[in-house]
Every structure is written in C-alpha cells, then in structure tokens.
Amino acid sequence: MENSEEESVGVAPQEFRELVLLESSLLEGEPSVQAPEQSPGAPAGDNQMVKPLVICGPVEDWVPLAEVLHHPDTCEEGDEATMAELKVTEVVDVKNEGEEVKDQKQEGEQDQQPELEKNPEQACDSKDQQGIQRLPLSGGGPAERRSKMEELELLQLELSFVNARCSGAFARIKAKVAKMRRPHFDRRKTIIQGIPGFWAKAMMNHPQMSSIISNQDEDLLSYMLSLEVEEYNPGLRMCRMMFFFSENPYFRNDIVTKDYQLSIIGYKESDSSTIEWIGQAEHGYANCMQDTTRLTFFNWLCAHKFPGSNRIAEIIMDDLWPNPLYYYPKEDHS
C-alpha cells in the first residue's frame, strides 16, 4: 500500500532519478529513496512517479519536480528583496542616463542654432561628426540653386563636346558628298545653260521662296543667268552662293556672292558683295531698300546680314540647289 501511494503522487523525468537518490542520501535522518522500477515495455526517458528533491526541511508531500523549480515560493524573501532592489536601481539608472543625454542634446541644439541662423548655406554644406554629408535645405534655397546651376553647367559642357564632335563628323561627311556630286553638277550646269530662265522659274515656283519674291524681284530675276553653290575652307565650313546676271538696268555686278558659315545650328552670314548701282538718282531703284522690315529677295541679295536671311540661305543651298528640277514648273518641261 505504501508503494502504491508513492507511485500515485508525482512524476519526474528519467534523467532526474539519480540526482534525487543522491540528494536524498545526503539529508540527515532521511532514508534513501529508491527509484520505482520501470514498468516493463515502457521506453527509457518516460516520466515515472518519484519523490521530488527538497533541499530544505523534511519531505512532507510529494509534488512534481517541475513545479518545485518554477514555483515562486522556492525563492527566499531575501532574494526577492534583492531582485526588486536591483530592478528599481536599473530603472533609475536608465532614466537618469536618458535625462542626461536629453539635456546634452538640448544644449548642443541651443549652441548650434545661432550659427545655423547666421549662415544657413554653411549648415547645408557641413558634415556631421560621422562625416556624413548633409542634404541641402528644401524650398529652393541658395545651396540648392547653386547645386542645380553646377549640374546644368556640367551638362552644357558635355553637350558642347558632343556638338563639337558632331560638327566635325558632319563637315567630313558633307565634304565627301560634295566631292562625289561635283561631276554631276558640272554636267547639269552645261545642260541648264540651254534652258533660258531656268533658275528664276525654279525659285519663283518654290513654295517658300515665292512668298518673298515681289513683282520687282521677278523683273530682277529675269536677268539671272545661273546659280552656283560651292563649299570652300573646310576648316571653317564656309559656303558661297554665286548669282550670275546679264546686263541689266539695276547694277553693274556680273556676279553677286553671298558667303555663309555652316554650323551645327544652321547658316550664319559672313560676307556679301557690294552692289554697284546704275544711275541711282535717275532710276531710284535703291528706294526699294527703304522698307527694311520686309524680307524680299532683293533686300536679302543686296543687304548684308538682313534679318531672316539665314532661312533663305538654307532653302537655296539645302533644297533648291540639289533639287532644282523638282521645283521647275511642269508645264515648261520640254
């Protein structure tokens, strides 16, 4: 009966059995506790009914060892007081440390605030103690504007290099094309000489050139014999237009030239012939130049750097000169 009561009280893991027997033998006046035999067929390590280890005092009741280890009453009162005191001390130390850091932070902010107000740009460009670069202030301040301008200048510098390389490549390609087309242009010149007024009709029939040709310009163009375009000075990429005229009542020039410099942005006039007028007092044809606000073929031909002349040069050299037959009136084809 005694063994049956002992087996019905508590259960301890297999690994604690030897420890229970050893500790029980050390207690004065307490008989050694024999571990209950393992039931047949039970695997090793299963929980068995044993008496727990009680370090202080006589063994009165049998309770599970796990409950003894985790029970709050196993700690003595002195230990509980010590643990409570340690917790309070730790909280106080953490609180004091936080207040101390907060006070140091407030003092540092108060010391830096006047300097930041005096020189906000320096505050944007300065680095912290760890060497991390601070971001510029938002809102379009001086530091941000300066950064944007520096970025824009750097981009413009890169674009200048690209434009220079493109200009050089474009000039080389254009020179090769001009050399290949020259024999064909020479043959075309010979053929056009047998077609009276060819260039004048092609110019007046051009949709963009016709808008700047007045009635007086048509009369002037009736004396035009030929048109030639040549490229010279490859280093400066210069182009020259030469207008050949027969004897006429307006000027003595047999050839009127217009020189332009070709760049990546278009044509820029550099020089033009000086017109030798015939009988300005009698004919008064120079009075047509009084309206300098209107762009006409005569104003463009006879004036130097007339406003809008770059567009006319572009039309003649890039469109009319390589493709004159395209603009020659169809009904005049023979």
Curated annotation (Swiss-Prot):
The processes (GO biological process) annotated in the record are: cell differentiation; gonadal mesoderm development; nucleosome assembly; spermatogenesis
Regarding how it is modified after translation, the entry says: Phosphorylated.
Name the organs or tissues of expression: Testis.
The family database entries (InterPro entries) matched by this protein are listed as:
NAP-like_sf, NAP_family
This chain belongs to the protein called Testis-specific Y-encoded protein 1
Region Disordered: list its residue ranges.
27-46, 96-146
Q: Which Pfam families match?
A: NAP (PF00956)
Similarity field: Belongs to the nucleosome assembly protein (NAP) family.
Q: What's an example of a GO molecular-function annotation for this chain?
A: chromatin binding
Tell me the function of this protein: May be involved in sperm differentiation and proliferation.
Instruction: Write out the GO cellular component annotations.
Output: chromatin; cytoplasm; nucleus
Residues carrying Phosphoserine: S4
For this UniProt record, the keywords arranged alphabetically read as follows: Cytoplasm, Developmental protein, Differentiation, Gonadal differentiation, Nucleus, Phosphoprotein, Spermatogenesis
The listed locations are: Cytoplasm; Nucleus
